[in-house]
Swiss-Prot record:
The modification N-methylalanine is found at A2. It comes from Escherichia coli (strain K12). One of its GO terms (molecular function) is structural constituent of ribosome. Part of the 50S ribosomal subunit. Cross-links to the P and E site tRNAs. The gene is rpmG. Coiled coil: none annotated. One of its GO terms (biological process) is response to antibiotic. NCBIfam families: PRK00595.1, rpmG_bact. Belongs to the bacterial ribosomal protein bL33 family. Disulfide bonds: none annotated. HAMAP family: Ribosomal_bL33. InterPro entries: Ribosomal_bL33 (IPR001705), Ribosomal_bL33_CS (IPR018264), Ribosomal_bL33_sf (IPR038584), Ribosomal_zn-bd (IPR011332). Keywords: Methylation, Ribonucleoprotein, Ribosomal protein, RNA-binding, tRNA-binding. This is Large ribosomal subunit protein bL33.
Protein backbone atom coordinates (compact mmCIF):
# COMPACT_ATOMS: atom_id res chain seq x y z
CA UNK A 1 0.00 0.00 0.00
CA UNK A 2 1.11 3.54 -0.72
CA UNK A 3 2.09 5.86 2.07
CA UNK A 4 -0.19 8.86 2.55
CA UNK A 5 0.96 12.39 1.80
CA UNK A 6 -0.79 13.92 4.80
CA UNK A 7 1.25 14.33 7.97
CA UNK A 8 -0.11 14.54 11.51
CA UNK A 9 0.54 17.85 13.26
CA UNK A 10 -0.25 19.43 16.60
CA UNK A 11 -1.68 22.95 16.94
CA UNK A 12 -0.44 24.48 20.22
CA UNK A 13 -2.11 27.46 21.91
CA UNK A 14 -0.14 30.71 21.91
CA UNK A 15 -1.80 31.67 25.23
CA UNK A 16 0.65 29.37 27.06
CA UNK A 17 -2.04 27.14 28.57
CA UNK A 18 -0.65 23.89 27.15
CA UNK A 19 -3.89 23.16 25.29
CA UNK A 20 -3.55 21.73 21.78
CA UNK A 21 -5.53 20.34 18.85
CA UNK A 22 -4.34 17.60 16.47
CA UNK A 23 -4.97 17.57 12.73
CA UNK A 24 -3.34 16.58 9.44
CA UNK A 25 -1.92 18.67 6.64
CA UNK A 26 -0.70 18.09 3.12
CA UNK A 27 3.03 18.97 3.09
CA UNK A 28 3.13 19.34 -0.72
CA UNK A 29 0.44 22.03 -0.99
CA UNK A 30 1.13 23.79 2.34
CA UNK A 31 4.88 23.62 3.13
CA UNK A 32 4.69 26.63 5.52
CA UNK A 33 3.67 26.32 9.17
CA UNK A 34 -0.03 26.70 9.94
CA UNK A 35 -1.44 29.43 12.16
CA UNK A 36 -5.16 29.20 12.94
CA UNK A 37 -7.41 31.12 15.29
CA UNK A 38 -9.29 28.60 17.43
CA UNK A 39 -11.05 28.45 20.79
CA UNK A 40 -8.94 27.76 23.89
CA UNK A 41 -11.25 26.36 26.60
CA UNK A 42 -8.71 27.03 29.37
CA UNK A 43 -8.79 30.83 28.91
CA UNK A 44 -12.25 30.69 27.27
CA UNK A 45 -11.17 32.88 24.34
CA UNK A 46 -10.23 32.52 20.69
CA UNK A 47 -6.44 32.60 20.38
CA UNK A 48 -3.88 31.82 17.67
CA UNK A 49 -2.74 28.20 17.50
CA UNK A 50 0.64 27.47 15.90
CA UNK A 51 1.82 24.26 14.28
CA UNK A 52 4.19 21.94 16.16
CA UNK A 53 5.41 18.42 15.47
CA UNK A 54 3.86 15.42 17.19
CA UNK A 55 6.54 13.54 19.08
Amino acid sequence: MAKGIREKIKLVSSAGTGHFYTTTKNKRTKPEKLELKKFDPVVRQHVIYKEAKIK
